[in-house]
Each structure stands twice: as structure tokens, then as C-alpha cells.
Amino acid sequence: MLLERVRAGSEKAAELCPFPRSPEIPLCAGCNQHIVDRFILKVLDRHWHSKCLKCSDCQTQLAEKCFSRGDGVYCKEDFFKRFGTKCAACQQGIPPTQVVRRAQDFVYHLHCFACIVCKRQLATGDEFYLMEDSRLVCKADYETAKQREAESTAKRPRTTITAKQLETLKNAYNNSPKPARHVREQLSSETGLDMRVVQVWFQNRRAKEKRLKKDAGRQRWGQYFRNMKRSRGTSKSDKDSIQEEGPDSDAEVSFTDEPSMSEMSHSNGIYSNLSEASPALGRQAGTNGGFSLDHSGIPAQDQYHDLRSNSPYGIPQSPASLQALPGHQPLISSLVYPDSGLGIMGQGGQGVPQSMRVLAGNGPSSDLSTGSSGGYPDFPASPASWLDEVDHAQF
């Protein structure tokens, strides 16, 4: 901006001065003192002494032009250095009148546009590589550096440890898997190995031990699951073999092995005296005739205490007999079956109630009935025949 010089006491000064005919004297923005000089400089509505208006950076006294940013006043060069476009190499401002070089979005001074390795200034047409930090490298130096890096990253030779050194390290590891620094220094001096080599050896050894323990645990669990699978397979094969075995196999379940009714002791007196001599409960085997009974008459009323309504050993009654029998009529409680028994008399016999009749003869079956033609079949010879030979159609 152009500086405005006002002469004190003149008519022009009276027109331009913001304090015409004012008793107050303006203060200088630089030294904060009253301005009583002949000339007053005015910049952005602020008054300055001629000697106080200077560049904030180079302290050059400004006479014709100045540049302002914030509260500072600058000359042209310093203003563009501070607030203008900066060089990507030296981070200094570039004046608008200076010739520059550009690489992508970066701007360089002419003397800053050079290789950082050989310091050679790059000219128009030269090939170069732009690094990530905006630095420049010529093609020759870049290829050389890349080749050296490839050679340096080649596989280094492995460190060889002798048997004696290995024994010393193993003994130290057995004492302490993670030794302190002074112990490693002592081992390094004893074995002649580098401190770094000793430290890496202990690290590798600890990692190896940890890996071996982990593998051992996996093997134990694997063996456990294999044994479980093998045992399950064996039990399954045993079941299959039992199903495939014939009737003579040990796995067959036979009812003939069970104890006979004569060997079973029940609280009820009905089955207490059954004998093997009468295979069909008193009748001859192979016939459907009557059966023999040995008794001394009809038992008294007090002999039926073993038979109750909820007793599991009571003689079942046919549905037809429920109506004909008197209420709570006692049944036969104790039966004795000797080898040669006496037959019970037929219908109308003395001593036998009319409501209960025991039919004897060559009829189709023995029956306990009240005149009904349909009754229960004879008791079979053995428990096995109860399950196999009973005709359920009769029920």
C-alpha cells in the first residue's frame, strides 16, 4: 500500500487529518508517543512517525510501499518470504518475481532443485526420483543406492556354536531359563560369543521349550480322544455280535433258567406248596382233564385272610362271575397238591357252595365259574409257557 504523508499545519493536513481543530495530538502506533513532527505517516488508519515506520523483519525504514499482515508491517521481500509460496527444499518463501522449478505439487528455488546425494543441480530434461519427503535424487545415484540396499539385505551367515560353548549355554539354561544381564555378560566372556548371540540363543531355547510342551499336550489329548473313539467302536461291535449270535449263544436269555414257582416263596399261601410232581397243577401231563386236590373240606372263614382285594396273588374272577358271586365271598386260600390227591366232587357236591363249582372230568379245561361257559384257561406248566402259549383271544 502507498504511504500517505501529511504535513502538519497546512490546509491539506487540515483536510486529511482525522483530528482537525482538535486539541488532541495523535499518538504514534510504533512508539506510542505524541506526534509533533512536521510530517505524519498514516497506514491503515494508524499514525506513525517517519522514523518509526520500519519493516518488522529487516528493520528497513519504509518510505513509499509497505505490506501489512496482522499487526506487523513488512517490506516486499520479507513479506513474500514469510507469507508467500515456500520452497519444498529449504522451506523459504519465494518472491513472485523469481524463477522456480516444479515437481508435481512442489515448488523449488533454482539452486534448491538439486540431487541430495551428489549435489548436482538438475536441469530441464534430467531424470530424477522424487522421494516421499520431497527430496530429489538423480537416476544414477538412485540405482546405485538401490543395489547397495539389496546387497546389504542378503542372508547373513549363520553363527556357529561349538560343542563346548553349547554345553556351557545348556548348563546356564538349566540353572536359569531367563538369566540376568550380568549372567549373560559372564557367559559371553566364557564362551567368546557376542552378547547378542547369547541373548538370541536363550530366546530361541525358551521358545523351543514352550513349543515342545504345547505339542506334548496336544499328543496327550489326541491319544485320549483316540482311546475314547476306540472304546466306543468296541462297544458297538459287541452289540452287533450279540445280535448275530445264534440260539446257543451265551448272550441268549432263556426263561428256563429262572426258578420254578415251587422255589419262589410268596406271602400268599396259594403258591406256597406247588410241587414238581404235578406238571399241570394236579392234572396229568398231556391231558386236558381235571386236576387233583387234597384237602380236608372247605376251609373256614378265618383261613382267607391272605387274600385281599388289592392282593397281587388273588385268583382272578371272570366278568360273568362278578354278578353271581356274593359280596366279598372268600376264595380258596391254601391248596395242597400231593402226588395222589382226591378229586373234588362235581356239581351239587356236598360242602361246596353253589356259587363256586370245580368241574372235574375230561372236559376241555378246568374252570372256576358260576355257570358261565366262558372262563379262564388252566395255569400253564412253567412261567415260560405263560408268555408264549396263552391265547389272548379268550380275554
Swiss-Prot record:
Residues 257-276 have a biased composition (Polar residues). Keywords: Activator, DNA-binding, Homeobox, LIM domain, Metal-binding, Nucleus, Repeat, Transcription, Transcription regulation, Zinc. GO terms for cellular component: chromatin; nucleus; transcription regulator complex. SMART domains: HOX, LIM. One of its GO terms (molecular function) is RNA polymerase II cis-regulatory region sequence-specific DNA binding. CDD domains: homeodomain, LIM1_Lhx3b, LIM2_Lhx3_Lhx4. Coiled coil: none annotated. Pfam families: Homeodomain, LIM. Residues 154-213 bind DNA. Signal peptide: none annotated. Its main location: nucleus. Residues 28-78, 87-141 form the LIM zinc-binding domain. Transcription factor. Defines subclasses of motoneurons that segregate into columns in the spinal cord and select distinct axon pathways. Acts in conjunction with LIM-1, ISL-1 and ISL-2. This is LIM/homeobox protein Lhx3. It comes from Gallus gallus (Chicken). The lineage of its organism: Eukaryota, Metazoa, Chordata, Craniata, Vertebrata.
